[in-house]
Amino acid sequence: MCNILIPSNMKTGIKKVKLHVKKNDTVTVISGNDKGKMGKVLKVFPVASRVIVEGVNIRKRHMRPLQGQTQGRIIEREFPIHSSNVKKS
């Protein structure tokens, strides 16, 4: 038996898809709650076909208190949207 390392995405049968946008591209949202907003692509997830766009799809994230902190906090950050919902500007 050979000890061959197989990437995890090949084990599950998920293929990496080439997206029409890259990091630092300026895009416009064409559908969803943030339709019409423009922003810069911060991060791309090719396997999931999702992108994070600056200022789009902002959600509140509740953070637990850490050992040194006495209080938790709520932060607002961008969450991924599907790449089919954006177009290059």
From Swiss-Prot:
Key words, A-Z: Ribonucleoprotein, Ribosomal protein, RNA-binding, rRNA-binding
One GO biological process term: translation
Any one GO MF annotation of this record: rRNA binding
GO cellular component term of the entry, any: ribosome
Family: Belongs to the universal ribosomal protein uL24 family.
Role according to the record: One of two assembly initiator proteins, it binds directly to the 5'-end of the 23S rRNA, where it nucleates assembly of the 50S subunit.
Subunit structure: Part of the 50S ribosomal subunit.
Name this protein carries in UniProt: Large ribosomal subunit protein uL24
Organism: Chlorobium chlorochromatii (strain CaD3)
